[in-house]
Amino acid sequence: MQEFHSSKDSLPCPATSWDNSVFTNSNVQGSSSLTDNNTLSLTMEMKQTGFQMQHYDSSSTQSTGGESYSEVASLSEPTNRYGHNIVVTHLSGYKENPENPIGSHSISKVSQDSVVLPIEAASWPLHGNVTPHFNGFLSFPYASQHTVQHPQIRGLVPSRMPLPHNIPENEPIFVNAKQYQAILRRRERRAKLEAQNKLIKVRKPYLHESRHLHALKRVRGSGGRFLNTKKHQESNSSLSPPFLIPPHVFKNSPGKFRQMDISRGGVVSSVSTTSCSDITGNNNDMFQQNPQFRFSGYPSNHHVSVLM
């Protein structure tokens, strides 16, 4: 046991070496204090050294003792005088020393790696609550009626889109140019009818689905209106060309025959039909006597057939 002098002016060298040994021992124990047993033994040792340091009046020894105590306390889990653990809940890098025997609050720098947060503090979610939104705008439960923004204005949504069911009365409805012109025409027509005191004709809805299916099958014109089937058939028949007439076989029979006007190129120009009552015997003699009406490739006694 070495003898210590109580003089305030000077301290022997063994005292300084003892202080250095305390620093080294405290650092080693603080670095290895990962279990509860090491922590308890370290705190008991520091309490004993704290009581021994109170007997000395030197300010240098008190400052070194306070620094060593604060350094060890920063490395180990701090406990107060009543045995309750003190949990550090902030990560600012500084902490107060509640066990300073002198009474002065010494603040020591604490690294973030040595601070252990409790389970409640460590279980905080890293992301906040996701606010529901659609195309960058808040949903209707979070946005008021006066702050509802329409995506059609910014060009985020195409021109034609289904209208929502819960539309406020004061909110505008966006339509394309064609629909807008139709709305204006209907408004003008209604205004004229109201000025003339005429009743506006209300369209009746379909009473059955079969009527709707029949309307879908009907022929429509260019404007989308229904066309009359009889007029449609007459127009088709009037537009049919004459060369679409089905071909007939021309027979040299006493009952009927067809008179043909053949052009110089051999193309049929017109067709005329006559009955046997209107034909005299001179026509038969004309066909038999005139050789220019005979075909060179066929004999005169064979029947001539022409296909249109």
Curated annotation (Swiss-Prot):
PROSITE patterns, A to Z: NFYA_HAP2_1, NFYA_HAP2_2
Span list, region Disordered: 53-76
GO-annotated biological processes: embryo development ending in seed dormancy; seed development; somatic embryogenesis
Family to which this protein belongs: Belongs to the NFYA/HAP2 subunit family.
DNA-binding region: 204-229
GO cellular component: CCAAT-binding factor complex
Pfam families reported in the protein's UniProt record: CBFB_NFYA
Motif (Subunit association domain (SAD)): 174-197
The protein's role, per its UniProt record: Stimulates the transcription of various genes by recognizing and binding to a CCAAT motif in promoters.
Name under which the protein is recorded: Nuclear transcription factor Y subunit A-6
Main location group: nucleus
Tissue/organ expression: Expressed in flowers and siliques.
Subunit structure: Heterotrimeric transcription factor composed of three components, NF-YA, NF-YB and NF-YC. NF-YB and NF-YC must interact and dimerize for NF-YA association and DNA binding.
Subcellular location: Nucleus
GO molecular function terms noted in the UniProt entry: DNA binding; DNA-binding transcription factor activity
Keywords: Activator, DNA-binding, Nucleus, Transcription, Transcription regulation
